[in-house]
Amino acid sequence: MKKRALVSVSDKTGVVEFVKGLLEQGIEVISTGGTKKLLEENGLQVIGISEVTGFPEIMDGRVKTLHPNIHGGLLAVRDNEMHVAQMNELGIQPIDFVVVNLYPFKETIAKPDVTFADAIENIDIGGPTMIRSAAKNHKFVSVIVDPVDYDVVLAELKENGEVTEETKRKLAAKVFRHTAAYDALISNYLTKQMGEESPETVTVTFEKKQDLRYGENPHQKATFYKAPFAATSSVAYAEQLHGKELSYNNINDADAALSIVKEFTEPAVVAVKHMNPCGVGVGADIHEAYTRAYEADPVSIFGGIIAANREIDKATAEKLHEIFLEIVIAPSFSQEALEVLQSKKNLRLLTVNIEKATSASKKLTSVQGGLLVQEEDTLSLDEDAISIPTKREPSEQEWKDLKLAWKVVKHVKSNAIVLANDNMTVGVGAGQMNRVGSAKIAITQAGEKAQGSALASDAFFPMPDTVEEAAKAGITAIIQPGGSIRDEDSIKMADAYGITMVFTGVRHFKH
């Protein structure tokens, strides 16, 4: 008995050549709708699905392959005598190959003007049912859902007259990954449409972007996946113009740098090391902003990641060229800037849209045995909601530095303290187990630049000791959430040293 293949694809890439190869191997081809029309237009002889089912396609093609003659031919266990007897009795012929990819649901809902009705119409029913049936019975059926696998299947057919068991298993596994991802897209779309914030189950799907040389350390394997509908203002959707392949640590650091630089509307540059900012500067233009980011910590910036929210011009590129950097990220690079920076063959240059995330964005954190899901911390300073409990209010420059420090501190690992002076950070204290410890680190790093600076704390002061350390260093302004039972002690300490202090009412822990 001749082998049979059922071919019905929405992605027509390479399908004509593949079917030619099947026919050359003496395999009969059954097809449907637009696929059948395309194959016949290319002079290929195929059998219509209605000839197999004895039933016409109905309901605008919604029902065409959901038939016992199809699924019996797919699911029958060929070495089971009862199955074979039932096939013979009912006139069902086996189907040995299924070549199907699904309605373009992902592409449909990505359209800005898509309607709910359009989305629903592009939910495939018959396709997933067929490929799942074939994949379940992969001992006897080869199922192909990705044009990239056409050549492998044809090569094995030409060499062996059949597809190897190992390849069939790989193809079957790919099918179930494919349908799981497809169903995840549908469930997530419908869940979002219904406005459900915390459904009883969460199904996420990611698409492989690239294999990485290794993970955080050389002994760890790693892969980079991207979300199907992630914001284009993300590392996953950045375009690499130049340099070495991104590493695991590069991607993490670039993500951190992007998150910080998105906080600013004025020209800003952020330098990051190990996912913490080591220098942030703002200015009238991107050159001035970079100069301040560099001066913030000219030691730590070496080997760092730079993110800018304006085009990199030639003058800025020449300054960047002077030191060793891993990555420069910006919305764009002038041609002259590219010529300067591309002379460093390993320097990675990335372009990406700079657009702040919304509260609708979700942050996923893996823990042992589970997953934490929360909204991204996108809350900006609400100047109408702040209070100033001290006797003195901030000056105009103090306000600028307080706002800069507050934007940065929420991106620093807690306990976090950031000092800012003259439109740039001058000290960053990160990840200490007590707040005053982080303050001491930031003050030590700032040195003389701590004099007249503004201090931001990601959480309240449990004791007035941080205010006292700030006063000793000459810090003149503080911004913090407030809310401690000992707030009054910190306020009295600030007043005693003439420090102005702002309460925001908002905490920004980062773990």
From Swiss-Prot:
From the Swiss-Prot or TrEMBL record, give the protein name.
Bifunctional purine biosynthesis protein PurH
Family to which the UniProt record says this protein belongs = Belongs to the PurH family.
For this UniProt record, the keywords arranged alphabetically read as follows: Hydrolase, Multifunctional enzyme, Purine biosynthesis, Transferase
| Entry-linked Gene3D superfamilies | 3.40.140.20, Methylglyoxal synthase-like domain
According to UniProt, this protein's pathway is:
Purine metabolism; IMP biosynthesis via de novo pathway; 5-formamido-1-(5-phospho-D-ribosyl)imidazole-4-carboxamide from 5-amino-1-(5-phospho-D-ribosyl)imidazole-4-carboxamide (10-formyl THF route): step 1/1; Purine metabolism; IMP biosynthesis via de novo pathway; IMP from 5-formamido-1-(5-phospho-D-ribosyl)imidazole-4-carboxamide: step 1/1
The record lists the lineage as: Bacteria, Bacillati, Bacillota, Bacilli, Bacillales
Q: Which organism is it from?
A: Bacillus mycoides (strain KBAB4)
Query: Which InterPro entries does this entry report, sorted A to Z?
Result: AICAR_Tfase_dup_dom_sf, Cytidine_deaminase-like, MGS-like_dom, MGS-like_dom_sf, PurH-like
Q: What is known of its domains?
A: The IMP cyclohydrolase activity resides in the N-terminal region.
